[in-house]
Amino acid sequence: IDNIQPHYTAVVIGSGYGGGIAASRLARAGQSVCVLERGKDVQARRYDLAAINKEHVVNPDSNYCFGEGGAGTYSDGKLYTRSKKRGDVQRIMEILVAHGAKDEILFDAHPHIGTNKLPKLVAELRESIEQAGGQVIFQTRVTDFLIEGSKLKGVRTQQSDVVEGRATI
């Protein structure tokens, strides 16, 4: 993998909303972050989705489940906010608004971003990670965890690259 550092504060596996928001918050806090995504970026992913729908050909690494933004990117755009393990839902909503969602999601009882808005939102989330000094690397599947003693030290990719971090998300 070009431009990969040997060690990061955090290695994030997957660029779904959870991984993207975690990486964005860490990068903006000045931490070194590397996001490893097995699928393609949101624009390139569209061609793989078209192949599924038109030709019935599925790329196992870039489809409705895998790729920038994860499974939520091509969902109906509804946000599930009723979890019993709430966390900081308001802060997450604010991050989504900062990256293109409408302000209404901050107070709607049933927040909805909209399918047509999600691809642009996830691309803007990636751009915010990169602008803050983080890296997002596509078409890179994590295949193994690197464990020394009882500590997780990093990951190995399908290309045999080793990516280490103090934390792995």
What kind of region is each of these model predictions?
Residues 1, 42-136, 140-141:
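Conserved N-terminal/central alpha/beta ligand/cofactor-binding core
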Residues 2-18, 34-36:
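Beta1/beta-strand and adjacent pyrophosphate-binding region of the FAD-binding site
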Residues 4-8, 158-167:
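Core beta-strand elements of the Rossmann-like FAD/NAD(P) dinucleotide-binding domain
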Residues 18, 39, 165-167:
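Glycine-/small-residue-rich beta->alpha transition segments that form the dinucleotide
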Residues 31-37, 42:
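Short beta-strand "acidic-cap" motif of Rossmann-like dinucleotide-binding folds
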Residues 138-153:
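A conserved short coil-to-beta-strand element within the FAD-binding core of flavoproteins
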